[in-house]
Amino acid sequence: MKLNTSKVRRSILESLESRTLFNVDPIWIGGVYIEEDGGSDLHGDSLFIQFKGGAPDTKLTKLLINTDQGLPGFSQGDNLFDTIKGGRGADEAFAFQIVGEDGRFSSANVGVELSDGGMLLTLTFDNFRSTDRLKISVDVDEVQFLNDPNNIPLFNSDLDPITSGAEFARSKLTAYFSAPHFEDAIANTVYRNEYDQEFVGSGLTLPKDNDGGLRDRTAGTATSIVQIPKPISLSGTVYVDNNLNLIQETAEKGIPNVTLELFRLQNGNYVTTGHTTTTNLLGQYEFGVNLGLQPGTYQVRETQPNGYLSVGAVTGLLNGNELGKTVSGNRDILTDISIPLGDSHGTRLDFAEAQPVQIRGFVYSDLDDDGVRENGEIGIGGIEIQIVSIETISGTINQTIRTNSDGSYRFEGLPPGRYQVIQREQPVGYLDGKDSPGTINGQTRGNSTVNDQFTEIDLRGAEEGVDYNFGEILPASVSGHVYHDANDDGIFQSTEDGISNVIVRLESSNGVSEIRTDHLGRYRFEGLTPGSYRIIEVTPTGYLDGKDRVGIVSGSVVGMIDGNDAIRSIALNAGNSGVDYNFGELLPSSLSGHVYVDANGDCMRDPEEDPLGDVLIE
């Protein structure tokens, strides 16, 4: 049977996983601080920010610079941002500015949260991408000695307006990243006075420790993190596909409580993930994101549900594209399910199942030879019936059974497919009759162009073929006598002798048969199929043709005289015995006398009365 090949892809197992699909470069994030004043507080200080790498479309969404280096709150050695003259801070104050080295950063795409005298700078970004470099300017002062923070003049008196690289060191940088298909990532690092070694291998293009000879005025930091893909999911349905088209249609229900197991490709082999699931009442299953499945190449294996036969696995969809491959020779596996990106969800990874089919019928005595099994037509038991598959969804079928005592047979639990049913033997005492293809869902399917065989019986899931019947015929016979009808009354009587070795012929649409009467004048034609017959007798030598008589079939006179020595229109049904189709014959008679001269006129010939010769007698 032809499956819907538009939905089926045949393949072999892949040997290697393309790991390049699933790995991404790490994110490198770095920052550099430069004190821009050498002995007086005349300029804002510079902060550089840059990141590189990560997954495609990775963005830096938020950045925190925390200058609280000790216990929470102001401590000796902490730094603060001096943005408003007359507030908390030493000497001059310089408000936050976006310098934007790359020329595209501005207040329109950089959000700022910063309080004068605060120790936390928060920046948010709309579109900060890999290799972008941001420069900002803001005044940074150091708490050289800690005085009462609530007494601002006293507190400011021991602030250092010049914050060297060593003094900015131990400030903390926290960066937040987002990227499609990956979990949000957070990088934490600490500024160091000597930082060039931190940048090795990063690819970042930030100022070096001694850039411009400002080694004692710089601090920097760099670190790398690896993004974690968001978990993926795989889902599908196990459903009843009795029409075998590998498409779940509205009326095709899911199959609950079917077990599925998930495997992952590792080092060229599929190994179990340890995850199994069962279908719900609608036949649906899912290996969900709660399992934390990472991008990779997977395989789903179905445990064949009881009472069903596999139609096939159906490749799924990922973002509208075909997902996975079927396995030649195993319809319970979907393999090569390649999910290269996190937060991807493979769907419609389905398994189609069909219910078994059956076919039944009778071997029976077809009394009227019409090919239709009717009331009163008995079954014939013990006859060998064979079913052979032409094509099925599950292997080759070749089974043989015998009919029950009522003539019935039934083949059950068959895989859907195309079949032929064969009657292997002719019942003893019967002639072969008409075979009638049965029906499936009220429609005739199959044909009987070959005797005692039905073929091309196409059974879809859960279908039952009924009345695939083989008719048999009880043979008919016709008999009678050829006899000497002594009294010429056309009735054979026990005292009248039969005539042996007389030729009797039987004509029908099947041809002509010829026999001779036995020593009692009897003849009998046996093994006749239902039909209309004509009997012809050849008048035996030495006899004259007598009267012929139409015989009896089932108590009724059947046939008619057809001229001399023939009886026609003898209608015989299956099992009929026509009797007393008799042909009477006559022995010839003689007549003699004299022509003479009746001298005395007494009409009696006397011895002396002379004969007359040469007289014409008619």
Q: Locations of the language-model features?
A:
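Subset of Sec-pathway N-terminal targeting signals
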Residues: 1-25
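Short strand-edge motifs at loop-to-beta-strand transitions and within beta-strands
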Residues: 134, 283-287, 335, 347-349, ...
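Short, acidic Ser/Thr/Gly-rich low-complexity loop/linker segments typical of extracellular
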Residues: 242-249, 254, 266-288, 367-374, ...
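A short, solvent-exposed beta-strand micro-motif common in secreted/extracellular proteins
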Residues: 294-307, 417-428, 531-542, 616
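Structured interaction patches on ligand/partner-binding surfaces of diverse proteins
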Residues: 304-347, 425-466, 539-579
